[in-house]
């Protein structure tokens, strides 16, 4: 059943909102405009072609990869674009608070590097091939801050391969991350087109009408696409489901972060940090899964975010 929503516009941080605005053919001008605020001038986009976002491994045992958005420019560059949420960064925080060795943010960075290998492999040609590649960009809009960036005010990070002299070794593989929580400008403080996009990522759902600083043509299209009243009944239902998952996951994550930090401090004082490693991690996942079930999330969603199997989740 679809219930009326108080918001006029969708939340771009939901899975439905992000893919509707940036991942559909009629709205690709919005994706192009946003990406061009991040890309170097020589790779600015005029057009993109959306590609299948699902990649299967080369063998039955290989993991598959499913991107939020995968597209290719008219000159061959490939772009993975993802909305990356804090909930998917949760386990590295829990492990550290219990004293287990882990590199800050390594889980998320490892995943980005792993994903980038698929567009590279896709370019291989049968028969004779000179190994010439077109550029691959992985763009992550982050709803969290990397742990090793918490004391850094810079919110835009462009990463590429460099040698020991900080000289670019290879310029066809780039990772671009935008840490949204660090963006705190008000409407009156917006200076650049990039600022305007970040403001909309964070505040679109709170607006009742397009404000004066956001009257550009591209944003007029965005406000039209994002207006919930323009959705079909099915689209409204899909958005409400997506919004519920986003809000439930956010609440569960915040609760678990608070509990994990409190437990870590208490355990560190009373016992030292000597917890069982594999067993402790499994118990963490099960506890998270239980809270997700209590919040009404589907087993498939819980499996995606915890790594537990459907059978394990059903047995909790």
Features from the language model and the residues they span:
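Conserved single-residue anchors adjacent to enzymatic active/cofactor-binding motifs
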Residues: 1-98, 103-236
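Short, charged alpha-helical interaction segments and adjacent helix-coil junctions
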Residues: 2-7, 79-84, 195-316
């Amino acid at each position: 059943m679809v219930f009326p929503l108080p918001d006029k516009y969708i939340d771009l941080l939901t899975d439905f909102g992000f893919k509707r605005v940036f991942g559909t053919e009629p709205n690709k001008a919005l994706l192009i405009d946003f990406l061009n605020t991040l890309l170097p001038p020589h790779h600015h986009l005029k057009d993109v072609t959306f590609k299948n976002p699902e990649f299967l491994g080369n063998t039955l045992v290989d993991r598959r990869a499913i991107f939020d958005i995968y597209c290719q420019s008219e000159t061959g560059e490939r772009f993975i674009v993802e909305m990356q949420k804090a909930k998917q960064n949760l386990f590295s925080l829990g492990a550290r608070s219990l004293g287990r060795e882990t590199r800050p943010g390594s889980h998320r960075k490892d995943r980005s590097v792993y994903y980038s290998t698929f567009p590279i492999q896709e370019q291989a040609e049968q028969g004779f091939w000179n190994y010439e590649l077109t550029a691959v960009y992985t763009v992550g809009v982050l709803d969290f801050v990397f742990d090793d960036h918490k004391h850094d005010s810079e919110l835009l990070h462009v990463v590429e391969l460099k040698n020991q002299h900080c000289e670019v070794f290879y310029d066809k593989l780039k990772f671009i991350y935008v840490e949204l929580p660090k963006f705190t400008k008000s409407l009156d403080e917006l200076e650049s087109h990039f600022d305007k996009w970040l403001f909309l990522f964070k505040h679109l759902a709170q607006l009742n009408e397009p404000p004066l600083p956001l009257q550009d043509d591209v944003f007029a299209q965005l406000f039209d696409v994002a207006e919930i009243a323009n959705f079909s009944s099915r689209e409204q239902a899909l958005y409400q489901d997506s919004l519920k998952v986003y809000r439930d996951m956010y609440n569960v994550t915040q609760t678990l972060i608070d509990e994990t930090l409190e437990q870590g401090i208490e355990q560190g004082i009373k016992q030292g940090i000597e917890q069982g490693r594999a067993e402790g991690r499994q118990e963490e996942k099960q506890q998270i899964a239980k809270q997700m079930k209590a919040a009404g999330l589907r087993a498939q969603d819980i499996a995606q975010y915890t790594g537990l199997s459907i059978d394990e989740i059903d047995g909790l």
